[in-house]
From Swiss-Prot:
Residues 62-85 are annotated as: Disordered. NCBIfam families: PRK02539.1. It comes from Streptococcus equi subsp. zooepidemicus (strain MGCS10565). This is UPF0291 protein Sez_0489. It is found in: Cytoplasm. Keywords: Cytoplasm. It comes from the Bacteria. Gene3D superfamilies: Helix hairpin bin. The keyword Cytoplasm applies. GO terms for cellular component: cytoplasm. Belongs to the UPF0291 family. PANTHER family: UPF0291 PROTEIN CBO2609/CLC_2481, UPF0291 PROTEIN YNZC.
Length: 85
């Protein structure tokens, strides 16, 4: 997210605590917060999709649901053509 938008979120939060927000400012704050949260969720999802879990013996123990997502995206050498990947 653009640093200017984050600064605006913080500015509106501070103003809300001190003098309150106008109607349009409340709408702007809600929109900016939703945009921030959506970006954060995308980032977390991207990181989780890139994780491969192995046990002490080196066996892949990645949960099947995550493996399926990785197959669809071709991550970690996984392929939809190879259900064992």
């Amino acid at each position: 997210m653009d640093p200017k938008k984050i600064a605006r979120i913080n500015e509106l939060a501070k103003k809300k605590k001190t003098v309150g927000l106008t109607g349009p400012e409340k709408v702007e704050q809600a929109k900016l917060r939703e945009e921030y949260i959506e970006g954060y969720r995308r980032s977390v999802r991207h990181h989780i999709e890139g994780i491969k879990i192995v046990d002490e013996d080196g066996n892949d123990v990645t949960p099947e649901k995550l493996r399926q997502v990785q197959r669809e995206k071709g991550l970690h050498g996984r392929s939809l053509d190879d259900p064992e990947s």
